[in-house]
Amino acid sequence: MATDRQYEDLLRLVLDTGTAKGDRTGTGTRSIFGHQLRYDLSAGFPLITTKKVHLKSIVYELLWFLRGDSNVGWLREHGVTIWDEWADPQGELGPVYGVQWRSWPTPDGTHIDQISQVLQTLRTDPDSRRMIVSAWNVAELDRMALAPCHAFFQFYVADGKLSCQLYQRSADLFLGVPFNIASYALLTHMVAQQTELEPGEFIWTGGDCHIYDNHVEQVTEQLGREPYPFPRLELRPAPSLFDYRFEDVTVTDYRHHPAIKAPVAV
């Protein structure tokens, strides 16, 4: 199996050519604007290998999004703490990703389940160009603990294969993006299984692609490592997209370098 270097090449590009910019957190970044990575999901599961990525957190976070949840309590019950820094004392985050995916509020007081709508369209009109899910609800941004970084995604069907493209307006390349790539690749596999399609491509499109100044040492260490071939994903069928459990997801042959710790910019 071929070794994929797209992500590492992007890290190097930003280190070498990025513009020094300030940011909301006050940390400082090196940044470029606009970049795309394409992953053929039949060639392996895109879980970055030049450092260990915590798969448990990725899977539980995606299941939490699909629950439509806005409280970190369920994540904490399963030993996942990646959202704790942004939660209030009651564990609430406001109307973040899962809320927008599953219950986008309308002016008449009802709610739209965007995920269910996309599933229905995939089954009845797979050539539609409207199979989009958005977390970027302008009217509710001020109530969110963190504005959506991975803002919206679109599905596309061709030759019996399902592809997904994500637009990530703000891309923390060292800490966040490896999670996001794997999460949406997993979602694409799940949706494909539920709609009797084969997984096609996952396409990651980044807007502000940045490396925080306090991650430069870690990125340099990571770039000194040779990538391994991607692992394989085994997904046990579930009755619906909303019935998958952690135990249904198995990643095999994940050969990786050691984890690299870095501070989160809050």
From Swiss-Prot:
Keywords: Cytoplasm, Methyltransferase, Nucleotide biosynthesis, Transferase
GO biological process, one term: methylation
InterPro entries with a match to the protein in the record: Thymidate_synth/dCMP_Mease (IPR045097), Thymidate_synth/dCMP_Mease_dom (IPR023451), Thymidate_synth/dCMP_Mease_sf (IPR036926), Thymidylate_synthase (IPR000398), Thymidylate_synthase_AS (IPR020940)
Subcellular locations according to the entry: Cytoplasm
Family membership noted in the UniProt record: Belongs to the thymidylate synthase family. Bacterial-type ThyA subfamily.
Main location class: cytoplasm
Broad enzyme group: transferase
Organism: Nocardia farcinica (strain IFM 10152)
Pfam families documented for this protein: Thymidylat_synt
Residues involved in dUMP binding: 24, 129-130, 169-172, 180, 210-212
GO cellular component: cytosol
Annotated Gene3D superfamilies: Thymidylate synthase/dCMP hydroxymethylase domain
Function: Catalyzes the reductive methylation of 2'-deoxyuridine-5'-monophosphate (dUMP) to 2'-deoxythymidine-5'-monophosphate (dTMP) while utilizing 5,10-methylenetetrahydrofolate (mTHF) as the methyl donor and reductant in the reaction, yielding dihydrofolate (DHF) as a by-product. This enzymatic reaction provides an intracellular de novo source of dTMP, an essential precursor for DNA biosynthesis.
Pathway, per record: Pyrimidine metabolism; dTTP biosynthesis
Assembly and oligomerization: Homodimer.
GO MF annotations, alphabetized: thymidylate synthase activity
UniProt catalytic activity: dUMP + (6R)-5,10-methylene-5,6,7,8-tetrahydrofolate = 7,8-dihydrofolate + dTMP
Organism placement in taxonomy: Bacteria, Bacillati, Actinomycetota, Actinomycetes, Mycobacteriales
Active site: 149
Residues that hold (6R)-5,10-methylene-5,6,7,8-tetrahydrofolate according to the record: 54, 172, 265
EC number: 2.1.1.45
PANTHER family documented for this protein: THYMIDYLATE SYNTHASE (PTHR11548:SF9), THYMIDYLATE SYNTHASE 1 (PTHR11548)
Name of this protein: Thymidylate synthase
Gene name as annotated: thyA
